[in-house]
């Protein structure tokens, strides 16, 4: 396996596990991961939220940790990266309004580079217009957005993931083992 440069686009109130776990896991196997957020610099941090599934009609939300950013968003050239990771949580709700973020997402699809999105990360994919004809899993409340963007919503178990071409998606953090394994396969192709 050759080490890859992976970009993680995140923001305030990203889901704690969905940022921290892949960030650390991908580095643990030798990849370089740069975590960025618009209007923030390397050394800044984003607030995270812990989403849990406790038997209510939707997930619960609790304060998470501070997640340190490792690169400056304004300095990023997506051409210098081999893959993209988009954690879920609240951040994709507002990141999808940022034209520079959408342009970065589009770069990875235009160049057929591996992309992973978890949970509400599908909102960013839908806004970028990259889901047409693709299977995409996400938190179930994102199904209308996936379908309105021309994607095929993959209604899978919360512990599963789906790969369609260069895209790996999962409904939420319980699917980390599944989506990380599928993403690693794409990284090694």
Predicted regions and their residues:
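Short, thiol/selenol-centered motifs that function as redox-active sites or metal-ligating centers
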Residues: 118-121
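Extended, subdomain-level signal for the structured scaffold at the beginning of enzyme domains
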Residues: 1-111, 124-135, 143-189
């Amino acid at each position: 396996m050759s080490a890859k440069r992976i970009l993680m686009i995140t923001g305030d109130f990203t889901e704690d596990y969905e940022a921290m776990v892949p960030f650390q896991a991908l580095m643990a196997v030798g990849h370089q991961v740069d975590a960025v957020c618009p209007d923030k610099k390397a050394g800044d941090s984003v607030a995270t939220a812990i989403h849990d599934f406790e038997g209510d009609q939707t997930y619960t939300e609790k304060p998470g940790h501070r997640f340190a950013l490792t690169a400056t968003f304004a300095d990023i050239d997506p051409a210098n990266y081999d893959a993209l990771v988009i954690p879920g949580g609240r951040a994709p709700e507002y990141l999808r309004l940022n034209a520079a973020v959408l342009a970065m997402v589009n770069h990875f699809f235009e160049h057929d580079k591996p992309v992973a999105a978890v949970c509400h990360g599908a909102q960013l994919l839908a806004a970028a217009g990259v889901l047409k004809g693709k299977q995409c899993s996400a938190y179930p409340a994102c199904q209308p957005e996936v379908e309105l963007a021309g994607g095929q919503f993959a209604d899978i178990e919360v512990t599963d993931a789906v790969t369609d071409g260069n895209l790996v998606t999962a409904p939420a953090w319980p699917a980390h083992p599944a989506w990380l394994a599928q993403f690693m396969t794409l990284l090694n192709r």
